[in-house]
C-alpha cells in the first residue's frame, strides 16, 4: 500500500509537470493538480489495504461487523488519539522539518548573499531531496508495521527474552537496509538527479540530505519498540528535542553554509532525536550493535559497496565520457542499483551479518539464501 501510494503520488506530480510543459496553464493550476496526487495516493493505499483485508478474512463473516462501534469500545478513542497521534507525528517528522525549512531557508539564503530569485532557485534544488527520502523510508515503515504486532505480543505475555530478541532483530534489519539505501542513493545521486531534473545541481547538498533515511529509519524503529511497551512520553520528548534543534540551527547553518548547512541542520535534528531515544531505551536493546560484531561488519559492507560504486562511476565516465541524456542517466542509475545491491548482499552473506532467522524475516530472504547455497 505504501509503495503504491508513493508511485501514484509521484506519477500525478509528473503528469502535472508534463501538462504544464506541453499544454501550458498557470503555476497555481499545476500546483493544484500536483497536490491532488497525495489524495489519489492515499485513496489507492486504503483500497489496497481493504482488498488484502477482505482477502485475509475471506470465508469469514467478521468483516461484516468489524466497523460496528460497540459501547465497550468507546474508551479506545483516547488510545487511538495518543498512539495513533504519535505514529502520525513520526511518520510526518521530516515533513515538519520541511515546514521549518519553508520558513527559514529562503530568508537565510538571502542573508547568505543570494538574490531573491537565486534564493528561490536554491531552495527548489534543496527541496528535491524530500521525495527521495520519503521513498527510501518506505522499507523502514514496512518493517515497523511487520514487527510491531510481535513486539506487543511478547510484551503483553511478559516474555522479556523473546521481546528483546525480536527488538534487536528489528533494529539490525532496519539499520542495515536503511544504511544501504542511504549510502547507495548518495553514491548514485548524480545520475538520479540528472534523470529527474536534467542537471547536476545540488549533488553535495542532496548527498548529505539523503543520509537522513538511515537516521529516520532507526528513529522510527526505536519509536515502534517504545510504543509496543506503552511508552509514549519518551518518544514525544525526543521528537520535541529534534524539532527544537532543527528550528534553532537551520537559520544559523544556512546563513554560514547555504543549503548545505540546511541539510546538516536536518541531520543534526535527527541525531538529537535518536540520541534521546537511545538514552531512554534499555541497554539490553542498545547492545544490538555489538553482538556478533554487527556494527563492524555493517561498516565494512557499506565501505565495500561504496568502493564498488566508485569503480562503477569510473567505468561509466570512461565509457560514456559523462552522462548527457536522461535515458542514459536512467539506465546508469538502474544498473548502479543492481551493482551496488548485488555487492552489498553478497558481502553481508559472506560476513554472516544476519542469522538465518533474520534472513527469513526479510521479504525474499529465503530465496536469497537458497540462491547463495546453490552457488
Q: Predicted regions span which residues?
A:
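Membrane-interface junctions at transmembrane-helix termini in multi-pass inner-membrane proteins
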Residues: 1, 211-241
